[in-house]
């Protein structure tokens, strides 16, 4: 990206990582591995319940239905109840996206900057991008964000191989 000062927010299927970078140096890091309710797994579960793709789910951010369940595993019963109450699919999808954003926002609020870079599979969620753009002056999504962790591992492995002098045969 060429940026020296930014917040990297990596939202994967099972965990969330926040990295603060100042002048090109990592100055702080936090991660959440305790709960999948703030991760891609939650979006996948809810998309399955609503019988939409995660890509379709991500399109909706307007008029979200209020969802209070904080557990990715048990939130399906709340959604079924909202469907029975007559909530529209678009409102339910927006509700899922907003509930994810609501869970992520306190986690990232302790890391403030003008630039936010989203990585991990959830970075492709258009609604999340919209919500975060209200909090940051600039929101960027990495190219192929779902592979960012794997790309980093490969890059690190290549660097380590060069440092310890392993030749390629």
What are these regions (language model features)?
Residues 72-112, 146:
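Adenine-nucleotide phosphate-binding core of ATP-dependent small-molecule kinases
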Residues 5-11, 28, 51-59, 83, ...:
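A polyampholytic, Gly/Pro-enriched intrinsically disordered region
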Residues 108-135, 146-149:
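Glycine-rich phosphate-binding loops at beta-strand->alpha-helix junctions
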């Amino acid at each position: 990206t060429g940026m020296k000062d930014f917040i990297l927010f990596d939202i994967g299927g099972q965990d969330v990582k926040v990295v603060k970078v100042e002048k090109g140096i990592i100055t702080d890091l936090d991660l959440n591995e305790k709960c999948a309710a703030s991760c891609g797994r939650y979006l996948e579960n809810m998309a399955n319940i609503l019988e939409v793709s995660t890509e379709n789910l991500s399109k909706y951010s307007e008029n979200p239905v209020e969802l209070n369940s904080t557990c990715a595993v048990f939130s399906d019963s709340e959604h079924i109840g909202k469907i029975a109450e007559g909530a529209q699919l678009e409102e339910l999808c927006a509700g899922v996206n907003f509930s994810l954003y609501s869970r992520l926002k306190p986690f990232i609020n302790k890391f403030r900057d003008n630039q936010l870079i989203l990585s991990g599979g959830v970075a492709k969620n258009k609604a999340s991008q919209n919500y975060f753009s209200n909090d940051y002056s600039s929101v960027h999504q990495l190219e192929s964000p779902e592979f960012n962790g794997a790309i980093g591992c490969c890059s690190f492995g290549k660097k380590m191989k060069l440092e310890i002098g392993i030749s390629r045969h």
